[in-house]
């Protein structure tokens, strides 16, 4: 059983997946910072300083000064502002991943195009062709 596990874990797909998960976790931190530190202030500038993450509705009917106050009071809360921020985070992540994939595909296509261009160039005469030409030239002389 241990040998089977070693075989499974040493396969390329598992290692690629592990690297992807680690990079994804780091990427999530970067995107979260991008949204919190750059996008939210920009959105707040155009919305008059509104912070979406503070938008909520207390389901117990009471009025609370903030989302933190409502959750501290133990009130059931519909925190739709957090959902809005999660959607914004998702859209930014999806856009960045789209741009990365598009860039990688463009680079791959360019590399494949260069390979095809090299393959399409007419090849010079082969050794056999040269030997045939020499044979024919010698036959004409002698």
Curated annotation (Swiss-Prot):
Family annotation (InterPro entries): Mechanosensitive_channel_CS (IPR019823), MS_channel (IPR001185), MSC/AndL (IPR037673), MscL_channel (IPR036019)
Gene3D superfamilies: Large-conductance mechanosensitive channel, MscL, domain 1
Membrane topology: Multi-pass membrane protein
Gene Ontology, cellular component aspect: plasma membrane
Superkingdom of origin organism: Bacteria
This protein's record includes keyword Ribonucleoprotein: no
GO terms for MF: mechanosensitive monoatomic ion channel activity
Subcellular location as annotated: Cell inner membrane
Keyword terms of this UniProt record: Cell inner membrane, Cell membrane, Ion channel, Ion transport, Membrane, Transmembrane, Transmembrane helix, Transport
Parts of the chain that traverse the membrane: 19-39, 41-61, 78-98
Role according to the record: Channel that opens in response to stretch forces in the membrane lipid bilayer. May participate in the regulation of osmotic pressure changes within the cell.
Assembly description: Homopentamer.
Family recorded in the similarity comment: Belongs to the MscL family.
Protein name: Large-conductance mechanosensitive channel
Organism of derivation: Roseobacter denitrificans (strain ATCC 33942 / OCh 114) (Erythrobacter sp. (strain OCh 114))
Phylogenetic classification of the source organism: Bacteria, Pseudomonadati, Pseudomonadota, Alphaproteobacteria, Rhodobacterales
Name of the encoding gene: mscL
